[in-house]
């Protein structure tokens, strides 16, 4: 795994700016502690920082083609590179290395951009073709690896992280209020947004073609992989592919099915070394770590269980600098990566299993809502409209109470994107904006988040399937994979996700939602198929996970930071939020019913830290956060 950055410029001046490229590379040096390199040629500057996983001795980048006419800066792993290499060698292509990077160049020189559809893996790369004066930015169809872009045909900048672009003298860091509004509602950035004005993401499965004369084209592509008929066979193939490395590979292990399945399959495939797994003992409930320990014992693998005491006052600013977006549940991801990075360079994660097999409560809730809408189509709306309005007048004066949210869900049955938004705590409406936001937000032209959701909502008649498709395209990519990439790379660890493998997903998608989740039972088919591999004890465990109760967490750990970052003076100075809302919540006793409100407070606090780091250019290491 690595980091890439650079630019394409119509003017031939790139060779005069090595210091600029070095500054951009320095911002992402944590992504590649094992080496770095630069390439300049006419209109192009390519930078690379390397974490060595495959071809440790000759895989340095940026990498030139054998004829010196093409150059690539690549972040990721190609799991089928050996198979592709053999095929290309048979056609006479001369290779100089044993790396997966050179295979990408060979595919391009042999097949053009059509060759990219043969790649199996996680990747984002920039490729320059001197012959045609064309450059390409490419991101994998699953969106596992990030790629940010800014600019236009005159000058297009890119980077594995937005901070690399911000290091270019042509850009300055400024918060995008509309993106912050999306973040406050979705708790991640859907679509191609970033939190910085003028910087966007290249969306998954896209090729951005830049040409010195003809301009920029955005080209969609997908992976050419045949769907199998057997999910277990496809899963075994995926895990086997994800063990491709010239270094030892470990596994994350929680108490659930997904990571246990990867460990069980990985143990069968790992013959040169004993498989190691890693578990974080933290959170509100130790049951998750206890279950992971039992899974490791049953599977016969080494488990490193690390008990960690939270000290957000020390690690939150650094975490935010890496994430570039305020996030609520990223601390445990970084702490687990730190544990694993002490032993291995690569870890496999069970991320994506719940998305593939309908494993979340929100899938079950949508199934129940769909059933209710068919049983009581007219009565439901009349009841919610008449009785609901009367009850709401007697509810808490706090905005967005749990009871009002449930009534809104019932009232909205049939409007499935809105129902989903309410289930996921999207709150956007004019009255709440006035309660929550300050003048800098209220004076901006903010997008209606429910309309944004409706515009992105898949056109599937089954609302549960539509929900799953939406979360695969947006929440998985821009929330879960985003956090996994940033927190692991901050620790010099590569994390791989077999459940997000394209050939595996194509096999799973041969089965419809009713087969994967019969009668609304989450992960039903997966449990049936994986029972022989894992046994009854693991399969029958209730779903748990690392949970942080936001009111308790905020009061226990963040109260000191709140005194520094959520003061009326600072809130007024930044102008983003309403100090009356903040003070009202801080004065209340922590309670479960305030969970939403404290999530909002947490995001507000981190947004203020974000402003100081990225807009005011304060080094996060200088923050005096300790009590």
Segments from the language model and where they lie:
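Cysteine-centered catalytic environments shared across enzyme families
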Residues: 1-322, 326, 333, 337, ...
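Structural motif
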Residues: 91-99, 170, 174-177, 458-471, ...
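Short amphipathic alpha-helical segments and their helix-coil junctions
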Residues: 84-92, 448-463, 509, 575-595
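Short Ser/Thr-interspersed hydrophobic loop/turn segments at strand-loop and sheet-helix junctions
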Residues: 47-57, 141, 245, 471-486, ...
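ATP-dependent adenylate-handling active sites, centered on carboxylate activation for C-N bond formation
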Residues: 8-16, 90, 131-156, 224-445, ...
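Glycine/proline-rich, flexible active-site/cofactor-binding loop segments
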Residues: 434-470
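PAPS-dependent sulfotransferase catalytic core
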Residues: 534-592
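Polar, surface-exposed loop/tail segments
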Residues: 38, 99-103, 522-529, 541-551
